[in-house]
């Protein structure tokens, strides 16, 4: 390697070997060569009207499409000739894309553990390398004057760039743009860009996020042409008066011009509201005096005052349009830039995070950029769909976890209305200790650029209300330095950072992850107090917003309603961000070509964290998990209180801070089981934060039969919005009405046929008309039930105390070690999956109009009786079999998963009908969104297709169930599934499940909660555990 390359890193004709010998990708002080300074996105319009109307700029040219591509196992394997021409065996690859999804290399999913040996700043010698090239032409007018830039919006993880064989530069940080001036290398006719992308770099140690590790040019590549004298940076702020009636648009402009040229140019600024010009101003270059050395010659400050501006919020995302034009002193336009502007003020005052003077309640979610087919390549349709789904399900905020997003994301959040936490691309979770790099000054340049460049790119977006220094990187001096940098360069927004215990000096907000409502987690040095306790700690006056909570992995989000009760109770608990938005599964195909969802390890990737990437509220195709409805219901902006029966009064409160309910209609109806007794609707007109009492009826309706009476209310939006269709339901609630019933005598038109008991040495047989029951005297089980000689059971009806473990039951045992505290491990250790059943008593009696049978079973493990179940069976003259079950539980057992009955039915009927909670899956600690009603669904719709199979599909608090010929009444939870317990426990992927004969029926008198505060430690609230020593329940079953 020649000394000239070391002393002059910008030497353009250095050989490939000389450049690679520098090993820039293993030098944390070297984050780039020749990369241009960060700035907001530029379009360089040459027409002010086009800038105002946001028309496509003629000076912006996408280079997305098919590029030439060659793959190598290490950068040193790339031949020198590639700099000048494509290799004979080069293929094509789409740009943007991740090369691991195009047939090269392997995607790796890991959460904490680094996918490479930890030896910062060094990375493996075998470092997969992708060599891209594109041949393109440039217009003559671009070559004759001005500057041509190439912009890479996202390349993972580091890359070198050549143009026509000349070395242009180097860059790393996969989530922010890298922009280079290539003007001097371009020629008339064809030009060639060559990009060498390295999978691993020292930057990889700062990108240890919980996600798939993939590589390549995965965001847009663009050519931008600017005039010789051009705009270099623009910063917009919108200070408001104390009463929010007057606003100012402050514009700070920096241009690329010399001191002698400055007098020849000026800046022209316009502010538009739609097609109405609100104001305009012009200003020559030259700043105010800064210090004893003078002024900035290349800067200009402009100001436009606005009276009674329409303020921006997520509820009412009012936007203006600012056009900033660079002109000659005579008024000739050189170029123009334009940005959406939202007038709003973010501040922390008296311990509260305020927007426009109102305390926010963050209804937030963490979102990775993930597409099941395209990996980390995001398209506009997917981004819009995510935003619309968030808005439809009452989210008002999103955290860009854990890196700056595609630039379009912020524009869409501005326009649709979402509060954004913009997060720097820094995570060192796998370091030991975690702050190893964060407290090392050698890594300060890399940290600094990742934070400062994010702020410089994104600061003009009104949707961004909080800056984040990164995620799970411990806490060190680098964080303190960057916190201070942001506070100086953008004092209009608070800074958030969770590391170091969530309440360090580098955060304006106490922002823990997975702190619980009422349980302390006193980890050494970084305790997680219960959230209500945290805000009452001495000298703690900051607001608390959970940066992550409610880990939505698989069948989860149990106990979610408790968080929202606390948020509404304590003003300084200002909400949080659910983890997370979408399951990060990728589409893969089996040997037969069938597509399936793949997770960690499915590509042969090592190391991997298996299905820990499946923790979203949505499936990868954006189909909702049932837990999404729980979030929607808990976060709804309209709250209801049932006040009185006569007259029937309802108190309705709006939690909107800025929005009048001008597109809301309240619908209500009162039902008796499956019958609507009375209903009505009325427009809902509420001012922000207002309460109104509505009289629905003067008196409640009378009823003439037994049943449960419910008042159901919902709020719909009759007109479509930018993010929802007409009649979108945005809020709902219901109450069981305590009405005394005066019922007539019960009567039954069905003919009474007393059952007959027949006893043999092996069986007790009971016959009633066409019905025939058989109890095995040895096993004590209901072995078969015939109707007109057709058998109804494939397996006996028997006790069930376990479930196919949820991710929350398995905990960290599913990753890399066994956790004896996990519920699944406790159940295994207790022997609940290997119980030996013995019938210790069975007795049958013939009564006048019924047969009465008593059975008693004990359940042993390792010789010890753990459970005892006594059942009283009564078969009456109408063919109804009633089962009273009493279960005694040994005190040595952990909480049971369920106490119930299970069997395999022979019938496979298409529809299921029930009266109880529905229509979607619900569990004892996740049923806020479910409603009591009469529901009908196809059998297959009762199953939730979690990618990693587990217990699913329960419906709680059921009063009546009808399935085929079966009719069951009582007070129970039920599940009907084509997949049995054994298969759900042993199968690793949903697509491998095979429908079994018949249908499995679970009837639970009791079911343990599912938890969801997190997925790696037991999180089911004590109220939702089954820790009693005795349980009793009853069901009545008949066949028609």
UniProtKB/Swiss-Prot annotation:
Keywords: Glycosidase, Hydrolase, Magnesium, Metal-binding, Sodium
Residues that, per the record, bind substrate: 111, 210, 472, 548-551, 615, 1016
Residue positions binding Mg(2+) 1: 427, 429, 472
Signal peptide: none
Cofactor: Mg(2+); Na(+)
Binding site for Na(+): 210, 612, 615
MF-aspect GO terms: beta-galactosidase activity; carbohydrate binding; magnesium ion binding
Enzyme Commission code(s) on record: 3.2.1.23
A GO CC term assigned to this protein in UniProt: beta-galactosidase complex
Co-factor binding details: Binds 2 magnesium ions per monomer.
Residues holding Mg(2+) 2: 608
InterPro entries, alphabetized: B-gal_small/dom_5, Bact_Beta-galactosidase, Beta-gal/glucu_dom_sf, Gal_mutarotase_sf_dom, Galactose-bd-like_sf, GH-type_carb-bd, Glyco_hydro_2, Glyco_hydro_2_AS
GO biological process terms, semicolon-separated: lactose catabolic process
Site feature: Transition state stabilizer: 368, 402
Pfam families: Bgal_small_N, Glyco_hydro_2, Glyco_hydro_2_C, Glyco_hydro_2_N, LacZ_4
Reaction(s) this enzyme catalyzes, per UniProt: Hydrolysis of terminal non-reducing beta-D-galactose residues in beta-D-galactosides
Active-site residue numbers: 472 (proton donor), 548 (nucleophile)
Entry similarity comment: Belongs to the glycosyl hydrolase 2 family.
Subunit structure: Homotetramer.
NCBIfam families the UniProt entry points to: PRK09525.1
Protein name per its UniProtKB record: Beta-galactosidase
Native source species: Pectobacterium atrosepticum (strain SCRI 1043 / ATCC BAA-672) (Erwinia carotovora subsp. atroseptica)
